[in-house]
From Swiss-Prot:
Subunit comment: Homodimer.
Residues that bind substrate: W18
Protein name: Kynurenine formamidase
Keywords linked to the UniProt accession: Hydrolase, Metal-binding, Tryptophan catabolism, Zinc
Protein's job: Catalyzes the hydrolysis of N-formyl-L-kynurenine to L-kynurenine, the second step in the kynurenine pathway of tryptophan degradation.
Reaction(s) catalysed by this chain's protein: N-formyl-L-kynurenine + H2O = L-kynurenine + formate + H(+)
InterPro entries, alphabetized: KFase/CYL, KFase_sf, Kynurenine_formamidase_bac
NCBIfam families: trp_arylform
Domain of life: Bacteria
Tagged with keyword Transmembrane helix: no
Residues binding Zn(2+) 1: H48, H52, D54, E172
Presence of the UniProt keyword Cytoplasm in the record: no
């Protein structure tokens, strides 16, 4: 059986979330007992909790919601690369373009170790020029371990709008700890939530034959 890596965050009460966004909670509704044969819980969370896919409607009022977004790009061969440098943005020069080699799905690692327990306001965003070059090489899906393609303080959302121009897809909040750079099969299907601007997902990388 091919080796598999789980690149999702664990949804839990102390999950770091974007400042001001909804904290995750899992509350008991029914519990197993003399009058109830099952356990049932109620979830409270943001559409951007943990590893998630942004829908086009997140950054474009006329964009599709996550339930209407085609699924093809969320499954298939991908390339995981580590960004060099330590500036606030991942610039084109920070990526190994020979390794990317025209991949349709590109995952970009910015953390040596993912900050699972603390919110990092200084995560490395992707520069819009990097998005443009990825699009020019044939990339259709970008996945990052950062909380967003754009900086926390951005009001212009330059990277997201570069994605919009090229009809690309976005995965954010992935965890690449313990996964070597290389070629993999990506499986990262977002939940089908009508009207939602994003959705959490269980993302995995599978070793290619």
């Amino acid at each position: 059986m091919a080796k598999m890596w789980d690149i999702s965050q664990t949804l839990r009460p102390d999950l770091p979330v974007w400042p001001g966004d909804t904290a995750f909670a899992c509350d008991e509704v029914w519990s197993i007992g003399p009058d109830c044969p099952v356990q049932v819980s109620r979830l409270t969370l943001s559409t951007h909790s943990g590893a998630h896919a942004d829908a086009p409607s997140h950054y474009d009022q006329a964009g599709d919601d996550i339930a209407s977004t085609p699924l093809e790009l969320y499954v298939g061969p991908c390339r995981l690369v580590t960004a060099s440098g330590n500036g606030p943005h991942v610039q084109p020069a920070d990526l190994d373009w020979a390794a990317i080699d025209g991949a349709t799905r590109v995952l970009v690692r910015t953390y040596a170790k993912f900050p699972a327990d603390d919110w990092d306001p200084d995560f490395r965003a992707l520069h819009a020029d990097t998005i443009e070059r990825l699009a020019a090489t044939g990339c259709r899906l970008i996945g990052v371990d950062a909380a967003s393609l754009d900086p926390q303080t951005s009001k212009t959302m330059d990277a997201h709008h570069a994605v919009q121009r090229h009809d690309m897809r976005i995965l954010e909040g992935l965890v690449f700890d313990g996964v070597p750079d290389g070629h993999y099969e990506l499986i990262a299907l977002p939940l089908k939530i009508a009207g939602a601007d994003a959705a959490p997902l269980r993302a995995v990388l599978r070793e290619l034959p």
